[in-house]
Amino acid sequence: MILDKITEKVLHMIDGEGFKQEGAFNLRENGIAVCHGDSEHVKIRKKEDKQGIDIYIDKNTNGETVHIPVVVSASGMTDVVYNDFYIEDGANVNIIAGCGIHNSGCNDARHDGIHTFHIGKDAIVHYEEKHYGEGEGTGARILNPVTDIYVGENSVFTMDTVQIEGVDSTQRETDITMEAGSRLTVTEKLMTHDRQEAVSNMKVIMDGDGSSAQIISRSVAKGESIQTFHPRAIGKTACHAHIQCDSIIMNDAQVRSIPEIDARNVDAQIIHEAAIGRINSEQLLKLETFGLNEEEAEGVIIENFLN
């Protein structure tokens, strides 16, 4: 299938490996699955009762990458989709999702992606989700993802979320339940500007002995934007968790970081850290001595901070 230039540009921004119509993939555009493919070990099926797909990843999957991006380019559209991932015991898979909105009109464009992961035992899953907005229109670009994750015994789940730019409003809801011996790493990166608003609520329940979680949030707030982070780690067994939230605040922005730790077992070990601050003037001065102006120096510092 030949894609138009807007779709190609948005896909380039949200799919770091480059979207290709090869292997297992599904491209959703303006509320319709416009193209999809299966591989030997990954099958994608359209839901019968509502919008969305079921992705079946069998136990013999070894390092395969599945691409399931979403593009919204119709002003005034509200797109709601339900995607369920069924990952068998022992599978090793990379999943690249994400959504980009191009809004050139005066009406809001919105995408709500509801993803549920059912992960078996001894599996390795790397999930990457990027959000991006663009367009010259006055209509807002809104993204509200909901992610529910069930991590089976001794499985490893890595989740990298990035909001690049251009998203006027987002509310992210993430719930994760972990069984014995499972490991979780979540890295969240976010940049807001102008009057954008972003809320991220995350709840991690360590329900099995020996489970461990690391949650890292890094953000930059510019202009008059507002950010709120509320990561919550609940330890019901002998487990480990570490929450770290770091933010750079600029101009007239507001950042609220509310890490919450909840131990319900004497052997639960949970740590949280949170820091909010402005760019260090000494760092700016040092870069300016190398010939950069203030804006360029800020750009270098922000890029290194988010990376």
Q: PLM features: residue spans?
A:
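Terminal domain-initiation and capping elements
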Residues: 1-3, 9-11
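Small-residue helix-packing motif on alpha-helices
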Residues: 297-298
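Conserved beta-strand/loop scaffold segments within soluble protein domains that form the structured core
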Residues: 9, 23-29, 34-292, 302-307
